[in-house]
Amino acid sequence: MHCPFCSAVDTKVIDSRLVGEGSQVRRRRQCLVCHERFTTFEVAELVMPRVIKSNEVREPFNEDKLRSGMLKALEKRPVSSDDVEMALNHIKSHLRATGEREVTTKMVGNLVMEALRKLDKVAYIRFASVYRSFEDIREFGEEIARLQD
């Protein structure tokens, strides 16, 4: 690590501590040239996989898009924003845990449907009707029947 005071390349770690519930490492460093001390923080960089759309176009994972889709389905439903954030974090963790560099929109959509099914059945039906392109009332009935099983 470069010294912020003299730009020397050689520094040594004097002290390391976990901070932020163990999600960060705080390090005290000392420059071996000018002997100044400074603090650095390290955080793991969690990379989300790219998303492959149905038309084969690949795009970066967009958390805002995921959130807005879920919030649209949950509109005027009695679900707390904390529950929505927990569901979003669960979906993101699941996607990262696949270890894949790319995931399909189908996989993301299925994870959203699973999360909504646990949060609110009405929101689940709303999302499923758009995601699965329900054509008529019969398809709504079939999905509701599956929910009741």
Swiss-Prot record:
Residues 49-139 form the ATP-cone domain. One of its GO terms (molecular function) is ATP binding. Its cofactor is Zn(2+). Binds 1 zinc ion. It comes from the Bacteria. GO terms for biological process: negative regulation of DNA-templated transcription. A zinc finger (unnamed) spans 3-34. Pfam families: ATP-cone, Zn_ribbon_NrdR. Keywords: ATP-binding, DNA-binding, Metal-binding, Nucleotide-binding, Repressor, Transcription, Transcription regulation, Zinc, Zinc-finger. InterPro entries: ATP-cone_dom (IPR005144), NrdR-like_N (IPR055173), RNR_NrdR-like (IPR003796). HAMAP family: NrdR (MF_00440). Negatively regulates transcription of bacterial ribonucleotide reductase nrd genes and operons by binding to NrdR-boxes. Belongs to the NrdR family. This is Transcriptional repressor NrdR. The gene is nrdR.
